Amino acid sequence: MSKRESSKYKIDRRMGENIWGRPKSPVNRREYGPGQHGQRRKGKLSDFGVQLRAKQKLKGYYGDLREKQFRAIFAEAARRKGDTSENLIGLLESRLDAIVYRAKFVPTVFAARQFVNHGHVTVNGVRVNIGSYRCKAGDVIEVREKSKQLVTVLEAVSLAERDVPDYIEVDHNKMVATFGRVPTLSDVPFPVVMEPHLVVEFYSR
């Protein structure tokens, strides 16, 4: 198991949930956290603990984002008009690495970030190598020609464990995706319950 995969599954164990819906997740076999004290029975969480856990789960889902980066995304969501929790989800789903993952160009969100960073993707015909790049509705994301036959890409397309959401249009023959619109929470196919309103409460304390 690679260091990246080990880190990913550590997040699953820490949360006690299979947050990406992966068949190989260790929480499918056990229901306790990582480390030597992982099997201890957990007590009831305080309100702060519940909010913190919701933040860690959402932050972890999008590739274990750094706290400074995640907080900056939240701050922008809070500045925008409308519901902050919905704005937060919209900003996270507009990230280029998130769209590459949703389009099933790669098997995991961790792989999506690396895939983008290595220059395998273009946006509207221009190569972009920043995973946090924010896409707009109508943007066309394409896997570069020389990258279309990479093993990780071919394996991802064949994965049956998740579907492409309806706010992204994909042609897997051409390896092209169009970001149709910024989604709301109810649009996003999270395998587990995400509670961005608790993230808002956490940062509003």
UniProtKB/Swiss-Prot annotation:
Disordered: annotated segments: 1-46
Boundaries of every S4 RNA-binding domain copy: 94-157
Keywords: Ribonucleoprotein, Ribosomal protein, RNA-binding, rRNA-binding
Compositional bias of kind Basic and acidic residues: 1-16
Biological process per Gene Ontology, one example term: translation
Quaternary data: Part of the 30S ribosomal subunit. Contacts protein S5. The interaction surface between S4 and S5 is involved in control of translational fidelity.
Family the UniProt entry places it in: Belongs to the universal ribosomal protein uS4 family.
Protein's name in the database: Small ribosomal subunit protein uS4
Originating species: Rhizobium etli (strain ATCC 51251 / DSM 11541 / JCM 21823 / NBRC 15573 / CFN 42)
